Amino acid sequence: MAISKLHLLFLLSVFLSLHPLVLSDTADEEDVLLTGINSYRASLNLTTLIHNHNAECLADEIADQFKNQPCTNTTGSASVPGTTPGFPNLPNLLSKCRLNPTVTRDGAILPACVPNLDPSLVLTNFTMSQYSKDLNDSKFTGIGIGSDDNWIVVVLTTSTPEGSYSPASNSGAFAFGVNGLVSSSLMFLLFCFFMF
C-alpha cells in the first residue's frame, strides 16, 4: 500500500513539473486567442501555428511596453498602416529574450488594444483587420502571445533562419541546457528512488 502511494506521489510530481499551473486570467486569454487563430487558419486550410517560447517572451515584453498607452484609433490593429508607434527599444527587448535581430527579420509583430481583453473582440481584432494578411500567410509557422492590461501582442515566426526566433547561440543554448539537465536529472533520481 505504501509503495502505491509513493508511485502516486511520483506521478503527481511528474505531472505538476511537466504542466505548470495556470494562475492568471492572462494566460487563459492568450490560450483562447491561440485556439481562435488556429481555428481561423484551419478554416483557410492553413497549418496551425506552433507555440514559440522565444516569440512569447518578446510579445510579453512588447505588451509590457504598451500597457500604459491608451487605446485609440491610432494604436494596434485599428491604426492606419505605418502609423502604429514603432518599438524604439526593440534591441533591448530582444536582449531580454536572448534573441538576435537577425533571427526576427521575417517575423511579424502585431499589437492590439482591446478594452478588458474581451476574447471575441480580441480575435476579431486579428482576423478582421489589417493583421489578417499576416495570419493568412502560409510562411508563418509559429506564434507567441503576450498581454498586459488592455494590450495583447502576437508575434508570428517562420521556419526560416531569419524568422525562427531562435535564441542567441552564446547565451540561450547554455541556459536551456543547464535547466534541462537539472530537471532531467532530478526526475531520473526520483524515478530511481521510487522504483528500486
Curated annotation (Swiss-Prot):
Covalent lipidation (GPI-anchor amidated serine), chain numbering: S171
Signal sequence region: 1-24
Compartments, record wording: Cell membrane
Sugar-modified residues: N45, N73, N125, N136
KW Transmembrane (keyword) present: no
Broad class of the protein's primary localization: membrane
Proregion positions: 172-196
Membrane protein topology class: Lipid-anchor; GPI-anchor
InterPro entries, sorted: At5g19230-like (IPR045285)
GO cellular component: plasma membrane; plastid; side of membrane
Keyword Signal attributed: yes
Keywords: Cell membrane, Glycoprotein, GPI-anchor, Lipoprotein, Membrane, Signal
Transmembrane segments annotated in the record for this chain: none
Family: Belongs to the UPF0277 family.
Identification of the protein by name: Uncharacterized GPI-anchored protein At5g19250
UniProt source species: Arabidopsis thaliana
